[in-house]
Amino acid sequence: GFNLRIVKWAKKFSFNNHYYISPQVWAWKESRVKILKECLNNLYVILPFEKKYFNEKHSLNVEYVGHPLVEHLLKLKKDTHFIEKYNLDGEKEIITLMPGSRKQEIKKILPIFIDVVNKFKSYQFVIAAAPSIESEFYLSIVKNNSIKIIHNNTYNLLIHSKAALVTSGTATLETALLKIPQLVCYKTSFVSFFIAKRLVKLNYISLVNLILNKEVVKELIQKNCNAKKITEELKELLMRKNKSILKEYELLFKKIGNNKASKITSKLIINSIK
């Protein structure tokens, strides 16, 4: 990507190169590691397993600094007027729908979520809209359903939620750090999935499961990502007290719970150039 091109350019002019937040070469395009090895002085990673990957497998100078999400979420204040502000039903618990950040995946996932909504009349479902996607796009899929759409307030929406249906990505980690039980749901075209399976060598798609190296949150992928299966798993999730999931979330927080990732990184860079 763009950052790697900048790194290569800077190396030509003998600049010290420090890279904060590694490209996910451990997931795909591992060949990019060669550029990192040739051009970087130090790499600062935000996921605990990345240090071992880069250090032991590829002999890079690596520092694990914690995840910057933590610093942001610890500063978050609960909006006590959230329900009234968005005209939500104070008598019904909320289930958040996070169908992705790209139109193509939303078109694939959201109709499945809508089929699930109809099975849970005693709950209210709210879409956490991607910032770059207009409400009209969601409404074209939701149509006359009672699902509400909220922009630019995902964290407060999650805080007020009983559970969430989440498409894979950073959203799974955000949901876990806010201690909300979740199901991870993902579906793409057969061709895209076939190609991805050949390129991506991971046991899980959720960052929560990747970091803890076990299935803490249920992953419903491809043929398992259907209304029937999601309904079954969501019913079970809502019936449980979720103590086991919350306990695992605590472990997750301990693993990445450094709330000074950016400060630590800046200090390490400054110390290296003194």
Residue ranges and their predicted role:
Residues 1-274:
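Nucleotide-activated sugar donor-binding and catalytic core shared by glycosyltransferases
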